[in-house]
C-alpha cells in the first residue's frame, strides 16, 4: 500500500514540478519510506524533501505558509533522523550507520547552518566523523582531518558555547591522530601553532 501511494505521489511530482503541493507530496513519500524503507532509502527521500524545499524557494507565487510548512517539515525531520541514526550507530557500532547519520547532519547544515540548533548538529557531525575515522578499516589522515576540522568549526560557530571545551580537546586529539603523533612525538617536536 505504501509503495503504491509513493508511486502515485512521485508521478504527481513528475507531472506538476511547479505545484505548491510538491513538498507535501514528497513529505508523504518520505513518511511511507520511514515506515517501510531501509535506512539508505530514508536518507535518500529526506534529500529529495530538501531538494523540493529548495526548488519551492526558487518559484515565484508560492505562499509563505506553504514555504514555512515545507521548511519546518524538512528541518524537523532532518534533525530527528540524524539524531536517531546517530543513536543507533552508537548502540550498534556500525560504520555504515555513522556514515548515514553524518550524511543527514551535513544535509541539515547545508540548509540550516545559521540557526541556533546548528551548533549542536555541527558538534554531533564531528562526533560521527570521529567514529567514522576510528571504525574505518584503513583509518587515514583524511578521515581524522575531517573530524578535526569539524570540531574546529564547532568552536568557531559558538566560541562561548557549551560544546567548546569538548570540541577543542577532540580537535587536538583528531589532529594528533591525523598526523600519527603519539605523546612522545609531541614532547620531542612541540607544535609551533595550534
Predicted segment positions?
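Acidic, polar-rich low-complexity tracts and alpha-helical solenoid repeat scaffolds
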Residues: 1-194
Amino acid at each position: 500500500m505504501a509503495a503504491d501511494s509513493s508511486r502515485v505521489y512521485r508521478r504527481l511530482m513528475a507531472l506538476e514540478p511547479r505545484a505548491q503541493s510538491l513538498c507535501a507530496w514528497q513529505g508523504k513519500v518520505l513518511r511511507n519510506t520511514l515506515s517501510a524503507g531501509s535506512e539508505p532509502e530514508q536518507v535518500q527521500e529526506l534529500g529529495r524533501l530538501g531538494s523540493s524545499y529548495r526548488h519551492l524557494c526558487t518559484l515565484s507565487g508560492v505562499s509563505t505558509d506553504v514555504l514555512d510548512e515545507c521548511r519546518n517539515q524538512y528541518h524537523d525531520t532532518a534533525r530527528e533522523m540524524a539524531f536517531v541514526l546517530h543513536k543507533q550507530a552508537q548502540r550498534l557500532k556500525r560504520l555504515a550507520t555513522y556514515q548515514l547519520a553524518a550524511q543527514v547532519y551535513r544535509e541539515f547544515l547545508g540548509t540550516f547552518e545559521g540557526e541556533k540548533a546548528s551548533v549542536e548538529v555541527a558538534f554531533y557531525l564531528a562526533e560521527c566523523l570521529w567514529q567514522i575515522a576510528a571504525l574505518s578499516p584503513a583509518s587515514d589522515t583524511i578521515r581524522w582531518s575531517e573530524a578535526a576540522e569539524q570540531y574546529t568549526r564547532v568552536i568557531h560557530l559558538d566560541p562561548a558555547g557549551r560544546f567548546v571545551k569538548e570540541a577543542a580537546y577532540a580537535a587536538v586529539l583528531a589532529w594528533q591522530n591525523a598526523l600519527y603523533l603519539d605523546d612522545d612525538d609531541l614532547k620531542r617536536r612541540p607544535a609551533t601553532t595550534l
